[in-house]
């Protein structure tokens, strides 16, 4: 079973390094859950999971309860994302013709903007038919983002053609134009996401389930599952690009509420606490197994702008020094982390290399050494 949500730092690829160590257990415990790759791979019969992210834990809680309002809200995203195809198809020939004139310098960028605006306005009746303003919250704002992103994409297409000294193929033209439309759709709902996290404007119009559906949509379609915020506290990762245009969003949603997922969460307790509060409360014992994937030793702030400092690393280490439960910790190898765990009785450290596809706010170097820190000698303990 794969993770349900795109989340940075997932450990699905690391499973091969720890498979031989994971013991049979009464309870599976994970204090830094995130996307939960190991949990979903193992599918434990009894689990306790925790994460400090309120948005993430609320998302899992809604799935666990098979919440109908959340299911409807997230299905609305899929419906409107699919409906966007009809709008694109209706206007594509006009947009393509306009771009063909723009690429040979028939008119300026300002005239391009006006021409695109006229084309979009010609599809107003279809637009208002396809997009329910109760869902979009503002069709005018959605159309504005589509216009701006489409004009920007057409401009970058021309720059690319000039740089490569060749024209894009018909397929590439269509893919790029579609990306302009879909990027505008994404940006509109990213704006709403920022209203939610900063408690502005549209946030007050949405129920909790609708906010969580927005959160899931943004996680699914932002570039590389990354998190990044500007100085105003606004999430600013762009749309994922051409490769995201044809993602099967309905299949993703169907999987969220599949019988296997519902059954797995039926046997799972979900918490939203500081990791040490969580571990102290549940009292892991010798029949339990703890998998830990904490933030790394770096200048890292978590995905809701909370820091995980060296004092937090020390709090974690102090707990693990005397843990009676079996545990596996995966973390970036730094002198500080090595010093924390070196020479401790019954704790051993194993090395492996990891290459990251994306870099998330200083968390991930492209090529780094990682440590497996554990009190397990082999699968039998």
Go through the PLM ranges and name each one.
Residues 1-27, 32, 37-38, 42:
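S-adenosyl-L-methionine
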Residues 26, 47, 289:
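Hydrophobic "anchor" residues on beta-strands that sit immediately upstream
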Residues 46-265:
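Class I S-adenosyl-L-methionine-dependent methyltransferase module
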Residues 229-231, 235-248, 295-315:
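Mobile active-site "lid"/loop adjacent to the S-adenosyl-L-methionine
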Residues 274:
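Conserved acidic residues
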Residues 279-285:
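Short amphipathic alpha-helix with an adjacent loop that forms part of the alpha/beta core around
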Residues 291, 297-381:
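Long, positively charged, glycine-interspersed low-complexity recognition regions
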